């Protein structure tokens, strides 16, 4: 929070969103943190370099105005929930699902098995209040591939219904980072929680994307991070 007070966390965000549009300053401040505390540097990177940047680069105006102020001020500590226990860096094969329910206009986020736990996620074990969760989007019975969703995890430090989290335990280093596992049991989120810069689901469940090819859409989303 001292870094927030000193405006050291906002370099990389646009001015209209309370940032300074200074990527060089963002990189320099991140590099300098290693001189003080390597765990703090990684926590910094998770909050503003992964969680915040995913909302900025994969979301649209609604997400920017609704979520980014809390991210930049650290009112909403967050996680970047991509890696899974059984899938590692094979993001295209992740098992977490987000199935659209047109009756309620909600996505249902679910972890189908132990291999699909989000694992070694920074901020997950203790501090994370929300996460950008990568999941297979299902709508109208079809799998549209991996998409990113804003998913609340905790409220005032307590896990929300259906959200599970455990600490990954002691590591060989960087033990100031609360790496943990995340899993979801039929967690419902609003339709607007889909970070929809490249694709969207309409209220009736119909899916649309400016990138027709599923593979190209997948790599475009990853490349935007």
Describe the function of each predicted region:
Residues 1-75, 126-127:
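Internal helix-loop-helix
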Residues 11-15, 32-36, 48-52, 114-118, ...:
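Glycine- and acidic
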Residues 54-57, 84-89, 116-117:
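Sensory/regulatory domains in signal-transduction proteins
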Residues 63, 104-110, 155-158, 183-197:
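Long, well-ordered alpha-helical segments
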Residues 69-89:
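Internal maturation/activation junctions in enzymes
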Residues 102-164:
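A short core secondary-structure module
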Residues 169-225:
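Glycine-rich beta->alpha junctions and the first turn(s) of the following alpha-helix
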């Amino acid at each position: 929070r001292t870094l927030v007070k000193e405006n050291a966390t906002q370099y990389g965000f646009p001015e209209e969103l309370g940032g300074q549009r200074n990527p060089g300053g963002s990189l320099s401040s991140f590099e300098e943190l290693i001189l003080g505390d390597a765990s703090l540097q990684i926590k910094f990177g998770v909050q503003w370099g992964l969680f915040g940047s995913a909302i900025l680069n994969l979301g649209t105006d609604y997400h920017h105005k609704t979520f980014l102020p809390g991210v930049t001020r650290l009112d909403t500590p967050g996680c970047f929930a991509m890696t899974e226990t059984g899938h590692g860096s094979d993001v295209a094969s992740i098992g977490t699902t987000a199935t659209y329910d047109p009756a309620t206009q909600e996505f249902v986020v679910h972890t189908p098995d132990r291999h699909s736990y989000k694992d070694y996620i920074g901020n997950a074990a203790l501090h994370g209040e929300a996460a950008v969760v990568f999941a297979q989007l299902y709508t109208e019975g079809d799998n549209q591939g991996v998409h990113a969703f804003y998913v609340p995890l905790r409220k005032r430090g307590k896990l929300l219904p259906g959200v599970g989290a455990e600490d990954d335990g002691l590591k060989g280093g960087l033990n100031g980072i609360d790496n943990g596992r995340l899993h979801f049991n039929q967690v419902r989120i609003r339709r607007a929680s889909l970070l929809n810069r490249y694709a969207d689901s309409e209220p009736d469940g119909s899916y649309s994307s400016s990138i027709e090819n599923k593979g190209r859409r997948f790599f475009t989303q990853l490349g935007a991070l």
